[in-house]
UniProtKB/Swiss-Prot annotation:
Name this polypeptide is given: 2-iminobutanoate/2-iminopropanoate deaminase
Cellular component, GO, one term: cytosol
Class of this enzyme: hydrolase
Site residues by UniProt (Stabilizes the substrate): Y17
SUPFAM superfamilies from the UniProt entry: YjgF-like
Coiled coil: none
Organism name: Bacillus subtilis (strain 168)
Stated role: Accelerates the release of ammonia from reactive enamine/imine intermediates of the PLP-dependent threonine dehydratase (IlvA) in the low water environment of the cell. It catalyzes the deamination of enamine/imine intermediates to yield 2-ketobutyrate and ammonia. It is required for the detoxification of reactive intermediates of IlvA due to their highly nucleophilic abilities. Involved in the isoleucine biosynthesis.
Gene name linked to the record: ridA
Keywords, comma-separated and alphabetical: Amino-acid biosynthesis, Branched-chain amino acid biosynthesis, Cytoplasm, Detoxification, Hydrolase, Isoleucine biosynthesis
PROSITE patterns noted in UniProt: UPF0076 (PS01094)
Keyword field contains Disulfide bond: no
Pathway(s) the chain acts in: Amino-acid biosynthesis; L-isoleucine biosynthesis; 2-oxobutanoate from L-threonine
């Protein structure tokens, strides 16, 4: 059984995909970039962009019946590995006691020239 997830509290997909999908008791998010729910890009520094990404992730996780506490894996894409520590600083505010598995990779470019994109896999409550 699969179910697409959509919430107006996170930006709409900018391509032919859903904000996330539930398969059985697992939620797989699409990558979130620092767009506001209205679709405007947050053009601040890496910390501001990362906070917006987490706001978007929170919205899709909640819509799926999951939360940061049920995330089992996160994948972080950053445009510049020199900003790894700053991303980690913000990331740790959302995963302070619960620490899911994670990968972090530097990429040549992200959609809309974002500095960071994060996707998660979580258990649905």
């Amino acid at each position: 059984m699969t179910k697409a997830v959509h919430t107006k509290h996170a930006p709409a997909a900018i391509g032919p995909y859903s904000q996330g999908i539930i398969v059985n008791n697992m939620f797989y998010s699409s990558g979130q970039i620092p767009l506001t729910p209205s679709g405007e890009m947050v053009n601040g520094d890496i910390k501001e962009q990362t906070h917006q990404v987490f706001s978007n992730l929170k919205a899709v996780l909640e819509e799926a019946g999951a939360s940061f506490e049920t995330v089992v894996k996160a994948t972080v894409f950053i445009a510049d590995m020199e900003q790894f520590a700053e991303v980690n600083e913000v990331y740790g505010q959302y995963f302070d006691t619960h620490k899911p598995a994670r990968s972090c990779v530097e990429v040549a470019r992200l959609p809309k020239d974002a500095l960071v994109e994060i996707e998660v896999i979580a258990l649905v409550k």
